[in-house]
Amino acid sequence: MLLSVSASHRDADLADLERLSSGVGRVWADAPLVAHGLDGAGVVLLATCNRFEVYLDVADGTDPQRALAVVRDLVRTVPESPLAAPGADDDAAGPGPDPSAALRVRVGDDAARHLFGVASGLDSIVVGEREIAGQVRRAIAAARRAGTTTGALERLFAQAQRTSRAVEAGTGLAAAGRSVVGVALDLAARSAPPWPLARVVLIGTGSYAGASLAALRARGCTDVRVHSESGRAEEFARAREAEAVPPGELLTAIADADVVVSCRGSVRPVLDAAAVAGARAAAERRAEERAGHAVGTAVQPRPLVVVDLALHRDVDPAVGSVDGVELLDLGTIRAHAPAAATRDVERAREIVDDAVAQHALVRAAREMDPAITRLRGRVREVLDAEVGRLPVGPVSREDAERALHRLAATLAHAPTEAAREAARAGRGEEYVEALRLLFPD
């Protein structure tokens, strides 16, 4: 039985999603426990900047509320985010609200419909964005590597990817290049210099950093410097014809930048207010020097736009209070996400519904697999017995005919006895109808 336990930006605020996603490692570590506790065998985890979802393949008859309780127990003890919400009282005591309360469970076709819609970008902050398709693909790949996937989950996620491609091809949602990164850069462009003149620092080297760099290049930005605390900046930048920020030079690079895009997703912020304020002070001194003013003369550097695309905040919210700095985070992006055309969304949902119906047919057919296996096993047993009765060496036509007749008689014996029993029980018509299904005229 297919189940999904999930929360998204539609059900919870980003702070709760951040806390849920903090438990990704724990959910993976306890995946065998989840499967064992639910008498099932399959777990796939999908955690992105605006959702936390667990897909389960469990035994038929499993109570969905039990599955919900198991997942809630796994994530309930996730620690608070290392960042307080903007304006929070530092002296406030006690834990925040339980983030697992936002989780909800879906069963069967509802779970499939949800995943197909997610993979198609219909449940994203920016409706129709294509980044989620890659995240869905990586989720099933991660489960495969962890050994927690099953045939049913493989088929589900394969259909989700086919549905995503069908929505992309059959609607205009993807044609506009809609994405979280795209909306963020459009917002940044309101305050930044024209992209061909802008100096950008990119923090991170993961898939989101790659998407961000591609989006910057598409807008004509050529001056991009890449920073990574993991040491992968050189390799990442070289492969994409960008420049790496030397180790220890991040704040110097920020002092020269017009835009900072961070998508590292670290547990602790990469940038805090003090560091950014220091970089701004250095930028002001350089502006004074370029203007030929005496040191201490007020010369304001160009504004700095900081874009934080990480769910686990890379940038302390207090950075937004630094003079001359505009901070754009996922909350800002969600508030400014453009609406998709109603016609495209309706067509996309039709495609999703068709995919759900197709998946249900496939799933129903696969439910007969155990019966088919038993049938084939019985035929193999009878065949092996008859082959064992044949003489060693060449077999005459007469011996082959006798063996085949015995095989046919043996195979027909049980159905024949069942036919007589059905007639005695007054169920002869049911048997005849079943026979027509097996051997149509």
From Swiss-Prot:
Substrate binds at residues 48-51, 124, 129-131, 135. Residues 81-100 are annotated as: Disordered. Pathway: Porphyrin-containing compound metabolism; protoporphyrin-IX biosynthesis; 5-aminolevulinate from L-glutamyl-tRNA(Glu): step 1/2. Its EC number is 1.2.1.70. GO terms for biological process: protoporphyrinogen IX biosynthetic process from glutamate. Keywords: NADP, Oxidoreductase, Porphyrin biosynthesis. The active site is at residue 49. One of its GO terms (molecular function) is glutamyl-tRNA reductase activity. It catalyses: (S)-4-amino-5-oxopentanoate + tRNA(Glu) + NADP(+) = L-glutamyl-tRNA(Glu) + NADPH + H(+). NADP(+) binds at residues 204-209. The record marks 114 as: Important for activity. Belongs to the glutamyl-tRNA reductase family. Catalyzes the NADPH-dependent reduction of glutamyl-tRNA(Glu) to glutamate 1-semialdehyde (GSA). Possesses an unusual extended V-shaped dimeric structure with each monomer consisting of three distinct domains arranged along a curved 'spinal' alpha-helix. The N-terminal catalytic domain specifically recognizes the glutamate moiety of the substrate. The second domain is the NADPH-binding domain, and the third C-terminal domain is responsible for dimerization. HAMAP family: Glu_tRNA_reductase (MF_00087). During catalysis, the active site Cys acts as a nucleophile attacking the alpha-carbonyl group of tRNA-bound glutamate with the formation of a thioester intermediate between enzyme and glutamate, and the concomitant release of tRNA(Glu). The thioester intermediate is finally reduced by direct hydride transfer from NADPH, to form the product GSA. Homodimer. This is Glutamyl-tRNA reductase. It comes from Beutenbergia cavernae (strain ATCC BAA-8 / DSM 12333 / CCUG 43141 / JCM 11478 / NBRC 16432 / NCIMB 13614 / HKI 0122). The gene is hemA.
